[in-house]
Amino acid sequence: MSDINTARLPFFQPPEFRPPCVGDDIEMVLTRGE
C-alpha cells in the first residue's frame, strides 16, 4: 500500500503537465490497488 502512495507523489500535478500514458497507468495502478 505504501508503494502505491509513494508512486502517486510525483503525479500530484495538473493532468495537462503529465503524458496521457502516465495518467492512464497511474489510474490503473490505483484501481488495482484499491
Curated annotation (Swiss-Prot):
Q: What InterPro entries does the record point to?
A: Amanitin/phalloidin (IPR027582)
> What is known about its processing and modification?
Processed by the macrocyclase-peptidase enzyme POPB to yield a toxic cyclic decapeptide. POPB first removes 10 residues from the N-terminus. Conformational trapping of the remaining peptide forces the enzyme to release this intermediate rather than proceed to macrocyclization. The enzyme rebinds the remaining peptide in a different conformation and catalyzes macrocyclization of the N-terminal 10 residues.
Keyword Coiled coil listed? The answer is no
- Give cross-link positions for Cyclopeptide (Phe-Pro): 11-20
Prosegment residue ranges:
1-10, 21-34
A molecular-function term among this protein's GO annotations: toxin activity
**In its keyword annotation, does this UniProt entry include Protein biosynthesis?**
no
Key words, A-Z: Toxin
Q: What family does the database annotate? A: Belongs to the MSDIN fungal toxin family.
Summarize the protein's role.
Answer: Probable toxin that belongs to the MSDIN-like toxin family responsible for a large number of food poisoning cases and deaths.
- State what protein this is by name: MSDIN-like toxin proprotein 3
